[in-house]
Amino acid sequence: MSVWQGRSRRKPTGGLYRPARKKRKYEMGREPIETHVAEEAFKIKKVRTRGGNLKVKVVRTGFANVLDPETGTCKKVKIITVRENKANIHYVRRNVITKGAIIETEIGLAKVTSRPGQDGTVNAILIKE
């Protein structure tokens, strides 16, 4: 079953809108890609978007680009686990990375600043404990 992002047929009053046309292909969406922490190989998924462009989505990753704000340097470090995720409390148990998630890395805790399901990479900024 596909995801449709058009207007609902139901009015706030409970009545129905009578559609003047059918559903269109450009109103379709997709299920979200949930980026997982994994020891296995880095896995991405390429998706064709509007205009024939490509969007790279991270499916599995074990590394993140972490910026140290004190020194201004960026390092590629191994992700150990997801500590906190405000998007969904169950994402912590499943090790799903989203923007704003707190991840535990080799050099300490870091907050994810990129959108792995949209950007194709995991960028984070180191936080002080």
Curated annotation (Swiss-Prot):
Residues 1-29 are annotated as: Disordered. One of its GO terms (cellular component) is cytosolic small ribosomal subunit. Pfam families: Ribosomal_S8e. PROSITE patterns: RIBOSOMAL_S8E. It comes from Methanocaldococcus jannaschii (strain ATCC 43067 / DSM 2661 / JAL-1 / JCM 10045 / NBRC 100440). Keywords: Ribonucleoprotein, Ribosomal protein. Part of the 30S ribosomal subunit. InterPro entries: Ribosomal_eS8, Ribosomal_eS8_CS, Ribosomal_protein_eS8_arc, Ribosomal_Se8/biogenesis_NSA2. GO terms for molecular function: structural constituent of ribosome. This is Small ribosomal subunit protein eS8. It comes from the Archaea. GO terms for biological process: maturation of SSU-rRNA from tricistronic rRNA transcript (SSU-rRNA, 5.8S rRNA, LSU-rRNA); translation. Belongs to the eukaryotic ribosomal protein eS8 family.
